[in-house]
Swiss-Prot record:
<dbReference type="InterPro" id="IPR015365">
    <property type="entry name" value="Elong-fact-P_C"/>
</dbReference>
<keyword id="KW-0251">Elongation factor</keyword>
<dbReference type="Pfam" id="PF09285">
    <property type="entry name" value="Elong-fact-P_C"/>
</dbReference>
<dbReference type="Pfam" id="PF08207">
    <property type="entry name" value="EFP_N"/>
</dbReference>
<comment type="similarity">
    <text>Belongs to the elongation factor P family.</text>
</comment>
<dbReference type="InterPro" id="IPR012340">
    <property type="entry name" value="NA-bd_OB-fold"/>
</dbReference>
<dbReference type="InterPro" id="IPR011768">
    <property type="entry name" value="Transl_elongation_fac_P"/>
</dbReference>
<dbReference type="InterPro" id="IPR008991">
    <property type="entry name" value="Translation_prot_SH3-like_sf"/>
</dbReference>
<dbReference type="GO" id="GO:0043043">
    <property type="term" value="P:peptide biosynthetic process"/>
</dbReference>
<dbReference type="InterPro" id="IPR014722">
    <property type="entry name" value="Rib_uL2_dom2"/>
</dbReference>
<protein>
    <recommendedName>
        <fullName>Elongation factor P</fullName>
    </recommendedName>
</protein>
<comment type="pathway">
    <text>Protein biosynthesis; polypeptide chain elongation.</text>
</comment>
<keyword id="KW-0963">Cytoplasm</keyword>
<keyword id="KW-0648">Protein biosynthesis</keyword>
<dbReference type="InterPro" id="IPR013852">
    <property type="entry name" value="Transl_elong_P/YeiP_CS"/>
</dbReference>
<dbReference type="GO" id="GO:0005737">
    <property type="term" value="C:cytoplasm"/>
</dbReference>
<dbReference type="InterPro" id="IPR020599">
    <property type="entry name" value="Transl_elong_fac_P/YeiP"/>
</dbReference>
Amino acid sequence: MVSVNDLKTGLTVKTSDGSIWQVIEFQHVKPGKGAAFVRTKMRNLRNGAIQETTFRGGEKIERAHIERKRMQYLYPMGDTYVFMDNESYEQLELTSAQVKSALPYLLENMEVSIADYEGEILGIELPTSVVLTIVEADPGVKGDTASNVKKNATVETGHVIQVPLFIEPGEKVTVDTRTGEFMGRYNG
């Protein structure tokens, strides 16, 4: 059990209904009148839902111990995706529902972290940025020089991102996996 006064960003907790939540934001509030409380924004690790919850100061909630395993993505197989444990070389098959949020950035041989709670796979954590190759890009409109003009570009995974006008097919770009935003050309 952990006191809500000790909550930190990234901490995982289990609520009374059995849901597993990760704290995204928290704020200790001590009003001039009345008891202190903690306002939180949390993400459900099973379905991705985000919820704002308020706890009374000093309230206790159960901490969920999430084990993170380093694994390598090998290949898709029908409706499943095959991963290999880097230490034991055991293979793990995940459904498309379990890897849905990672699919736009998932490349073969990519190292990922798989979140496991008591044998239940909760999801995949990607590196914060990935290098992807542009396979198709809308043409840039000549003379359109307004600042920060973007165009659509399709990367090798089939995902469409917004890139600056000067990016052409065949170029490698760095993409933020948390926001899906273009970070820059890859220089490597």
